[in-house]
């Protein structure tokens, strides 16, 4: 399974790097199945994956941000975000990825996950019960100390006011625009928390965004919790399910941050 995910990620990575410098990837070419506008670069990457699955007879159905659910007749589902961080991609900010997980019904039953940074080629992979790795080396979360920690926060006009309370628990904040890679930073111990508390339902997180990175973080020793239920975050394999969440490496952050969240 890992080899299949690596093959798919390599297809997207190679196809992206072969694009001409004047490629107009920002152009909107329609509406995706999720209800969000589809950029030309999103559709390009998704079509590269779907074509590969067909050409190499890879036995997976697909749930993708743009195409929605593609029933190819298989129980195992590839949960795909062909370009996570589209705006970063089209603006030349080197922090965007292809994100893939394999499961059957929801995020919590995913067995394999792979996130590849399409700007520098870094590969994050996890198998349920098998730990997490970056570029073939095991990774693990790190301990929280206020003065040394970095929190990745969802910011802007749709950010819940509680975000400002959470910000006070760290001396450094980032908002990087690619949920999958931000969570991988927590998994590898270079950030200590990721917090998304959004007042606009249409901008909350979906399963295609973080199915892969959630398994990677959990296998690295961290956790992702639902801000509403305070329990483990789970998302059904549908584009209609959206949630706010906290991802952390150190268990002490769960109580510390959730106490600030309405």
PLM region descriptions:
Residues 1-83:
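N-terminal subdomain of lithium-sensitive/metallo-dependent phosphomonoesterases centered on the IMPase/IPPase/PAP
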Residues 61-65, 89, 174-177, 226:
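General beta-strand structural signal in soluble alpha/beta enzymes
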Residues 74-129:
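DPxDG-like acidic metal-binding loop motif
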Residues 9, 128-129, 140-262:
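An extended, acidic
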Residues 29-30, 37-38, 91, 174-175, ...:
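Short Gly/Pro-enriched turn/cap motifs at secondary-structure boundaries
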Residues 49, 53, 98, 102, ...:
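Buried hydrophobic packing segments
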Residues 42, 53, 86, 117, ...:
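Residue-level signal for inorganic ion chemistry
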């Amino acid at each position: 399974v890992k080899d299949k995910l690596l093959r798919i990620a390599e297809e997207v990575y190679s196809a992206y790097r072969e694009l001409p410098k004047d490629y107009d990837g920002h152009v909107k070419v329609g509406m995706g199945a999720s209800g969000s506008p589809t950029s030309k670069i999103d559709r390009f990457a998704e079509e590269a994956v779907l074509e590969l699955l067909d050409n190499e007879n890879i036995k997976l159905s697909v749930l993708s941000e743009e195409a929605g659910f593609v029933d190819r007749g298989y129980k195992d589902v590839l949960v795909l975000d062909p370009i996570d961080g589209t705006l970063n991609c089209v603006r030349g900010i080197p922090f965007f990825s292809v994100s893939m997980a394999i499961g059957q019904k929801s995020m919590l039953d995913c067995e394999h996950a792979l996130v590849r940074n399409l700007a520098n080629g870094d590969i994050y992979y996890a198998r349920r019960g098998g730990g997490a790795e970056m570029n073939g080396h095991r990774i693990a979360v790190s301990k929280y100390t206020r003065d040394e920690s970095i929190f990745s926060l969802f910011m802007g006009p749709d950010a819940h006011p509680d975000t400002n309370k959470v910000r006070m628990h760290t001396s450094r904040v980032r908002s990087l625009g690619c949920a999958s890679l931000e969570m991988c930073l927590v998994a590898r111990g270079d950030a200590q928390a990721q917090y998304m508390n959004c007042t606009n339902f249409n901008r909350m997180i979906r399963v295609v965004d973080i199915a892969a990175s959630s398994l990677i973080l959990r296998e690295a020793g961290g956790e992702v919790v639902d801000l509403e239920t305070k329990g483990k975050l789970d998302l059904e394999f549908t584009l209609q399910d959206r949630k706010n969440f906290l991802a952390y490496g150190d268990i002490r952050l769960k109580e510390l941050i959730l106490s600030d969240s309405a």
